[in-house]
């Protein structure tokens, strides 16, 4: 049997431009977090009930890697390595829809990562813009994206699946 943790390490040896992990459930979260912290564009999925709970979970999973990994290391690393958390929900028709998008500011206060609401569903089910935004607009610019334009262009109050 080949563990996901080993596959993540082997993938990093290939010097990829991006690393995408289908589902993070255990100690492989540490290796993914280290890759993200080194500047490698990465994405993963995990199961949680909200964007905030996903942040808590991604802070907890690396602790499964061993006794020498502490939350004093993991929490600030998550805060600096992850920009956005997109929470999907399953609607009545079985479609996945964006429920909320949260931005991580990079700041930690009393062991809690500061997040802000970028998008959320209102009481009518419309996806609406929150007050938050991801930090590091210059990185989006270097990649050819105008962050302000991307965030302001969402005006369709979409109820659709993504």
Report residues per predicted region.
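Nucleotide-state-sensitive switch-loop elements of NTP-binding domains
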Residues: 1-10
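Short Gly/charged-rich anion-binding patches and loops
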Residues: 6, 30, 132-135
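Residue-level detector of solvent-exposed, low-hydrophobicity positions
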Residues: 9, 19, 53, 76, ...
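Conserved P-loop NTPase nucleotide-binding/switch module
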Residues: 11-109
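NTP-binding/hydrolysis catalytic cores, primarily Walker-type P-loop NTPases
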Residues: 93-162
